[in-house]
């Protein structure tokens, strides 16, 4: 068969996930109160992630709430670890370069991997790998404007086979605000992890900061990881982690995933890669509802980049849309996939 194929490891995972998903497609189960999709996760895989002692001092963990830029951060760090050389990101699928801690094929259950290991997690802090907190392993938490997260997660739920149908835009927004979506409440997630700020081995950075100054953000990440880069290598990291470069790289754009996991007919996994797209989707009423819940939930916390831009006009990198009635969260999108 022509073209690159998923590795055998992923084929094994696909078979296991598909078998479970066919039995309870679109169903969630709860692990310690948090909803998880059946198939990709099991109580056993979550317990392994939480309780394993298989943590090394030079491990690197990327932690995010879903649809907050996980894959963008993976690409950046993979390039940093290779001094800007794009060979790795062009030859190995992104999910294998940075496996997940909590999935049915867990990063902790894979054959021995060389250090430094790069791993990802969507887990809230109370379910995260306990051994990491007593180690020197580095944790990078990437946050994103929750309004954009809602839009991206809504569209992703339409193409990810193992997720519940999102229902109407209004239903999905209400479920998101109540934490009745995969991995639970965004508010609880970020409030839990933000407490780690100030620890030497913890870096909090946002999707918006990456967009506003990718080069400066990469330099900050390099400093945190103790891996300084020269100007040429730094420029290579910035160039090869740009959204257009990732979207063109079939090792990073998820086009290798089979239809049993991702319905490519419904849209692309990497959708727009911008900040502020929620303004093209939220109605005035939805925006007001969201703002009220946000103020109540985030009271007393430091401000974030999206707080300063919430009242700005157009999304970053976009021209001001022509004035027309807001179509709401489910506006027709020519490419309704998911942001990074």
Curated annotation (Swiss-Prot):
One of its GO terms (molecular function) is nucleic acid binding. 3'-phosphoadenylyl sulfate binds at residues 67-72, 144, 152, 207, 241-246, 271-273. SUPFAM superfamilies: P-loop containing nucleoside triphosphate hydrolases. It holds the Pfam family Sulfotransfer_1. Its EC number is 2.8.2.2. Isoform 1 is expressed in skin and testis. Higher level of isoform 2 expressed in skin and intestine, moderate level in the kidney, low level in liver, stomach and placenta. Gene3D superfamilies: P-loop containing nucleotide triphosphate hydrolases. Substrate binds at residues 95, 100. It catalyses: an alcohol + 3'-phosphoadenylyl sulfate = an alkyl sulfate + adenosine 3',5'-bisphosphate + H(+); pregnenolone + 3'-phosphoadenylyl sulfate = pregnenolone sulfate + adenosine 3',5'-bisphosphate + H(+); 3beta-hydroxyandrost-5-en-17-one + 3'-phosphoadenylyl sulfate = dehydroepiandrosterone 3-sulfate + adenosine 3',5'-bisphosphate + H(+); cholesterol + 3'-phosphoadenylyl sulfate = cholesterol sulfate + adenosine 3',5'-bisphosphate + H(+). GO terms for biological process: 3'-phosphoadenosine 5'-phosphosulfate metabolic process; cholesterol metabolic process; negative regulation of cell population proliferation; positive regulation of epidermal cell differentiation; steroid metabolic process; sulfate assimilation; sulfation. Keywords: Cytoplasm, Endoplasmic reticulum, Lipid metabolism, Microsome, Nucleus, Steroid metabolism, Transferase. GO terms for cellular component: cytoplasm; cytosol; endoplasmic reticulum; nucleus. The active site is at 122 (proton acceptor). InterPro entries: P-loop_NTPase, Sulfotransferase_dom. It comes from the Eukaryota. It is found in: Cytoplasm, Cytosol; Microsome; Nucleus. Transmembrane segments: none annotated. Residues 301-340 are annotated as: Disordered. It is an enzyme of class 2 (transferase). Belongs to the sulfotransferase 1 family. Sulfotransferase that utilizes 3'-phospho-5'-adenylyl sulfate (PAPS) as sulfonate donor to catalyze the sulfate conjugation. Sulfonation increases the water solubility of most compounds, and therefore their renal excretion, but it can also result in bioactivation to form active metabolites. Sulfonates cholesterol. Catalyzes sulfation of the 3beta-hydroxyl groups of steroids, such as, pregnenolone and dehydroepiandrosterone (DHEA). Conjugates efficiently cholesterol but has a greater affinity for pregnenolone sulfation. Does not show high activity with DHEA. PANTHER family: SULFOTRANSFERASE SULT. This is Sulfotransferase 2B1. It comes from Rattus norvegicus (Rat). The lineage of its organism: Eukaryota, Metazoa, Chordata, Craniata, Vertebrata. The gene is Sult2b1.
